[in-house]
Amino acid sequence: VAYIPAGSGNDFARGAGLPKNPKKALQLILAAQSPDKVHIMAYEEKISEKKGIAVNNFGIGLDAAIVHATNHSSTKERLNKYNLGSFSYLFSILRTLFTQKGFPILVDAGGKQLSFSNAFLCTATKHPFFGGGIAIAPTADASKPVIDFVMVERINIFKIIWLILLLMQKKQLKSKYFHHYTTNRLRIVSTTPQYGQEDGEDVAPRPFDLQFSTKNQLFFK
């Protein structure tokens, strides 16, 4: 498999250390003598009995609601014409910050049982980035056979602004409202219907019972 970045986000290119310029990416692919091993996520959603893979992240809650708002935004296509697609994402963030409510989740991170009553953002990721370059999990490494799980609690707007400032400095791990775990197996259960997103593709609101593991994929790069 080979990957040529062509969208407005290109988080996989960032996370896998690929050029964001399509021509440079193609040149590397054509010059490659053999493929490299990249660890990606395999998942199974027990309620819908759906199985699949994700190379970026799978989220429920805030990030998924933002993806839904962005993908269905009337301004996204116009902004993309001028290479300003990231602004569409920013507008969706500002709107969704005020409308997304907290929800309960149960988590099993490699045998460690966790319970959160007021989750806001809940994401399993294979590399640091989402949303077009936001380092939500700055220590994540796509070359390792592990999954990074990030959960942010629902807090008031002033604390959210402070957390965003920490996020911009990659210091969000200092916040007690930001939870980060690294594991080789992960289960997330949300009984309250929420939007989902799988590699930037929105999933209609539903309860989730997600199980994640890693698998190898060979990439020419």
Each predicted region: which residue ranges?
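Catalytic core of DAGKc-family lipid kinases
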Residues: A2-L114
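Short glycine-/acidic-enriched loop or helix-start segments at secondary-structure transitions
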Residues: F12-G15, A65, G133-I134, I161, ...
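Short, hydrophobic/aliphatic alpha-helical segments
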Residues: Y43-I47, S117-A119, L186-I188
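AMP-binding/adenylate-forming core of the ANL superfamily
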Residues: I53-V55, A119-A124
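Short, catalytically relevant binding-site loops at active-site mouths
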Residues: L62, P128-F130, N156
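ATP/nucleoside-binding phosphotransfer catalytic cores, i.e., glycine-rich phosphate-binding loops
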Residues: A109-G111, F116, A135, D141-K221
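Glycine-rich phosphate/pyrophosphate-binding beta-alpha loops
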Residues: L121-I136, D202
